[in-house]
Amino acid sequence: MLLINHGTVMDMEGHCWQDGYVLCEGSRIVETGQNFDQSLYRGRVSGDEVLNVHGLQVLPGMLEAHCHVGITEEKKGIEGDDCNEGTTPVTPQLRALDAINPMDVAFQNAMKAGITGLMIGPGSSNVVGGQFVFLK
């Protein structure tokens, strides 16, 4: 188990705990709250599995509602830009899923910034740019 303890914890239900904690098992959050009671989890949470985040904020993953991550690549320049099709103003046949480069460093940058879900779509210069895809 992983314990993230002593931070300002905000959850999706509107709670905000000043001395809050998040308890994780594997990749799942199993409990959130305030003033963690170590005696309830004796033997299940060892010292190396505790992150003391005093003075920091702990937030749920953010969702990016409109972006071009992976289709206008940060490092590739024009060669990696699959965002726009300039032949016509209406391009509903374009699918972001077909253009995404999963190796684009923008995915790592988004994750480091706390973004865990991306709505990616083509066409910033078209009236109808194409079909979006949501990636988590």
Model-derived segments and their meaning:
Residues 128-136:
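Mobile "lid/hinge" segments at catalytic clefts and subdomain interfaces of large enzymes
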Residues 38, 126-128:
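Short secondary-structure capping/turn micro-motifs that flank functional sites
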Residues 9, 13-59:
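Histidine-rich, glycine-flanked metal-binding segment
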Residues 1-5:
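Extreme N-terminal starter segment of soluble prokaryotic enzymes
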Residues 18, 77-80, 133-134:
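Short, glycine/charged-enriched secondary-structure capping and boundary segments
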Residues 56-122, 126:
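Metal-associated gating/positioning segment near the N- to mid-region
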